[in-house]
């Protein structure tokens, strides 16, 4: 096995593009990505705006609670989220891929900081 082959070829790329389901894989990835990005943009902007500009009871505590969820490793939440998706009957659906990622604490924090900097 060599690190750099003498005669490089694009044959593997051609084989992948000829595969029947490859376009479906790309479409699935695109669909999930667009839904998650749009959901994050909409919901995180609303939550970030509320934390930045509105006054309500428990604002600091709630924001600290949201930020503290960023300290929980993703590996710890994978099995409980899977069990929840199984209870909902969402296994092998787009909902199971998109709903858990629609709002993320990092995006809430990022958009809160952005809205606070607006005049």
For every predicted segment, state its role.
Residues 1-119:
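A structural signal for multi-pass alpha-helical bundles of membrane permease subunits
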